[in-house]
A protein has these predicted regions:
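Structural marker of alpha-solenoid helical repeat scaffolds
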Residues: 54, 87-89, 122-126, 161, ...
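Helix-start (N-cap) detector for alpha-helical repeat units in TPR-like alpha-solenoids
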Residues: 25, 59-60, 93-94, 127-128, ...
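Alpha-helical segment of the N-proximal tetratricopeptide repeat
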Residues: 24-50, 54, 194-220, 224, ...
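Structural signature of tandem alpha-helical TPR/SEL1-like repeats
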Residues: 37-46, 71-84, 106-118, 145-153, ...
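Terminal, low-structured helical/coil segments at or just beyond the last alpha-helical repeat
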Residues: 167-174, 182-201, 342-383
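TPR/TPR-like (Sel1-like) alpha-helical repeat modules
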Residues: 119-122, 136-143, 148-166, 173, ...
Length: 383
């Protein structure tokens, strides 16, 4: 495991054990706690094993046994211990996080991603330290899975709290340049490019945002690697964050010269053109994006909005329904679909979409940005 996110000192306690227990079990439980607090790890592991054999329903015992084994890099044994916590559904959340970490360390990346998604669905439970470690590894796996924006949403709060850190810089660089690698296995000749992008992304994520330093690193990235894919698109997104739409559009068009089928750049330009009410150009770009990737939800969303603006309601409904199918957690899609249904006289469907929009917007108001984005991931992964 990586240095910053290496060892977890667990201070998370599950529900207390039953009040009435056999004397022998009670003795073992106290001895295990003493060994753990005195950092006599081998003794603590042995005693927690003995205690869980005497009382298989001992949740604290399984928790501490799993966490101690995890800190000793004994990941398969830790996994087996944490599995016992799933008997009690009220404590699944932290166990999901640890199972994800264990599977990550043993190279079972798809299983780890599934466990982290389950953890998100269970409410992101755990100590601050556990959440930091789990969110970091979750983000790495999202990058590996090609979900770069969602990965950055998870990493950004860590960057705000922890500041400059080489692991976060590397992770943000990979996601920013849309490289589906884990930090330990990308080609070494790409190291500087990833580092420059990561530094720019990290400074842009700070609170308050340090766009001056972000632009400095982005300019260095572009001057050295401006002929490489993803560099101009990344710089365009930075300009977009800064509110510099003209420069953002210029960078997106530069990206299309290098990668004519770059779907995110096509979608970004289509969105900008629609904001300027250039529907014809927006439609052309969005249709190009759909032709390259028919599962790009935002391209269908944009086409639906264009058809709506042109009063072609049936075409708008078809595109927005496709967008909803691909991204059911996007509140704006639901809002635009409600508008179309209302204009078509489909009153009940319009109300259902309006209710869904309000529910999703209310959820956004009470959840941090990574949570709302990753709830969408969980729903999409179920399809």
């Amino acid at each position: 495991m990586r240095p910053l996110f290496s060892v977890l000192v667990i201070c998370f306690s599950l529900a207390a054990s039953a009040a009435t227990v056999p004397d022998h079990f009670e003795t073992i439980a106290k001895q295990a706690e003493t060994a753990r607090t005195q950092e006599r790890v081998p003794d603590a592991i042995r005693l927690y094993r003995e205690g869980t054999k005497l009382r298989p329903s001992w949740e604290d015992g399984w928790w501490y046994l799993g966490s101690l084994l995890y800190d000793q890099d004994r990941f398969p044994e830790a996994t087996a211990a944490f599995q016992h916590l799933f008997v009690n559904t009220s404590h699944r959340g932290p166990a999901y996080a640890f199972l994800g970490l264990c599977n990550f360390e043993t190279g079972k990346y798809n299983d780890a991603l599934a466990q982290f998604r389950a953890w998100a669905g269970a409410g992101w439970a755990g100590t601050r330290e556990l959440r930091d470690v789990a969110e970091y590894h979750f983000a790495l796996l999202l990058t590996r899975d090609g979900r770069f924006v969602e990965s950055l949403y998870l990493i950004a709060p860590l960057a705000q709290r922890l500041g400059e850190n080489p692991e976060l810089v590397e992770a943000m660089g990979l996601a920013s340049l849309r490289m589906s690698y884990l930090p330990e296995n990308y080609p070494p000749e790409q190291r500087e490019r990833i580092w420059l992008a990561g530094k720019a992304a990290l400074y842009a994520a700070q609170s308050p945002k340090d766009f001056e330093r972000a632009d400095e690193y982005a300019a260095r990235l572009e001057s050295r690697y401006g002929t490489q894919p993803e560099v101009h698109y990344f710089r365009g997104t930075l300009y977009g964050f800064e509110g510099n739409r003209t420069e953002a559009e210029r960078e997106y068009r530069e990206e299309l010269k290098i990668s004519p089928n770059h779907v995110p750049a096509l979608v970004a330009l289509a969105g900008s053109d629609l904001e300027k009410d250039d529907r014809a150009e927006a439609s052309t770009l969005a249709q190009r994006a759909v032709a390259v990737d028919s599962n790009e939800a935002e391209a269908h969303h944009l086409l639906g909005r264009i058809f709506l603006a042109n009063a072609d309601l049936h075409a708008a409904a078809a595109e927005l329904e496709k967008a909803k199918q691909l991204a059911p957690g996007n509140p704006l899609i639901r809002s635009h679909l409600a508008m179309v249904y209302s204009k078509l006289g489909r009153t009940q469907e319009a109300k259902a979409e309006s209710d869904a929009f309000l529910a999703l917007k209310n959820k956004e108001e009470v959840m941090e940005s990574p949570r709302e984005k990753l709830d969408e991931i969980n729903r999409e992964s179920a399809h």
